[in-house]
Curated annotation (Swiss-Prot):
Domain of life: Bacteria
Subcellular localization(s) per the UniProt record: Cell inner membrane
Keyword Chloroplast: no
Membrane topology value: Multi-pass membrane protein
Identification of the protein by name: Cell division protein FtsX
Self-association and partners: Forms a membrane-associated complex with FtsE.
Residue spans crossing the bilayer: 66-86, 213-233, 264-284, 312-332
GO biological process, one term: cell division
Family: Belongs to the ABC-4 integral membrane protein family. FtsX subfamily.
Function: Part of the ABC transporter FtsEX involved in cellular division.
Keyword Cell inner membrane included in the entry's annotation: yes
GO CC, alphabetical: cell division site; Gram-negative-bacterium-type cell wall; plasma membrane
Length: 341
């Protein structure tokens, strides 16, 4: 009699395990790699580390770093200081504008009312800062005092001097003054419109010479500044040559190698800009004491202005950019030499 064999428990077929469910992806991730936030965090962390490393290396050589910034600051402050002095000269009590006055000699039959009405009309014209009327009587009195011919002039039967309207223009360049003089000469009651261009031309020549001198000096000193920062960064590159070669050997990119040196150049520029701002503020304040004393002897209250905040910020931004550009040029020049041997 045959019997049916019952399988043992160990021989029973175990059920197939269920297929593992794929892990849920975090929001924002895809199959191609990390999300944008992760990449941004890594990028920012890399820049933070590069800046911290640059600060640490500059802090290890405080004296050398300070003198490098000081040399750059002197190069920055010289053209900026001359430019500020030119601006102060242009504002010297308005004397430049007074030197460019236009004198309108009226006809002899023009009375005081005609002259005052003409003065009021001219004040409302574009390009005119101010207008003053000098009557015939006032003109004769001033001429008597200045010429010393008072007794002789009193013997004249009639006053030979006309009334004058003295016009102060807003612009001091020659073409604008000529155009204004031509318009004023066409007004009624005006006999002659006289413009003394000698002082205007002298002013234009002085300011033009000063501007060109400042521009040329700025170009030369900026070139020297780029050489200074470039040579400084080159020395830092040479000191880290082995480290850089190892980084490139393990796959470090040129951007990764370049980054700390760019931050170092920008930090040099920032320090130089702050020092230059301080040098300018101290220098102008030091000169101002002598200028105030000199102007007081001439009955003027002229004083040198300080460094405007806008100019100071422009100086800082320009210094940082120059340091960055100088470092970029130095690294780009030596980057090909840093390939692993």
């Amino acid at each position: 009699m045959s019997t049916t064999r019952t399988p043992k428990v160990s021989e029973r077929v175990a059920p197939k395990p269920a297929d593992p469910q794929p892990a849920k992806k975090k929001r924002g991730e895809d199959d191609d790699g990390p999300d944008f936030r992760t990449l941004l965090h890594a990028w920012l962390e890399s820049h933070r580390a590069s800046m911290a490393d640059s600060l640490r290396r500059l802090g290890k050589q405080p004296i050398g770093s300070f003198f490098t910034c000081l040399v750059m600051a002197v190069a920055l402050s010289m053209p900026m200081g001359l430019s500020l002095l030119l601006k102060n000269i242009e504002q010297l009590g308005g004397s430049w504008q007074r030197a460019a006055q236009i004198s309108l000699f009226l006809k002899l039959d023009a009375g005081s009312r005609d002259g005052e009405a003409l003065r009021d009309e001219i004040k409302g014209m574009p390009g005119v800062a101010d207008a003053q009327y000098v009557s015939r009587e006032q003109a004769l009195e001033e001429f008597q005092q200045q010429s010393g011919l008072g007794e002789a002039l009193r013997e004249l039967p009639d006053n030979p001097l006309p009334g004058v309207v003295v016009v102060t223009p807003t612009e001091v360049d020659k073409p604008a003054l000529e155009a204004l003089r031509q318009r004023l000469s066409e007004l009624p009651r005006v006999e002659v419109a006289q413009l003394d261009l000698v002082w205007v031309e002298r002013l234009a020549a002085i300011l033009k010479l000063g501007d060109r001198f400042v521009f040329g000096l700025a170009v030369m000193l900026i070139s020297a500044l780029l050489l200074v920062i470039g040579n400084t960064i080159r020395l830092h590159i040479e000191n880290r040559r082995i480290e850089i070669e190892v980084i490139k050997l393990v796959g470090g990119t040129d951007a990764y190698v370049r980054r700390p040196f760019l931050y170092m150049g920008a930090l040099y520029g920032l320090g130089a800009g702050l020092l230059a701002w301080g040098i300018l503020a101290f220098g102008l304040n030091w000169l101002n004491e002598a200028v105030v004393g000199l102007s007081g002897l001439y009955g003027s209250d002229f004083a040198l202005g300080g460094v405007p905040a806008s100019d100071g910020l422009s100086l800082l931004i320009g210094a940082v950019l120059l340091g960055y550009i100088g470092a970029w040029i130095a690294v780009a020049r030596h980057l090909n030499e840093l390939a692993p041997r």
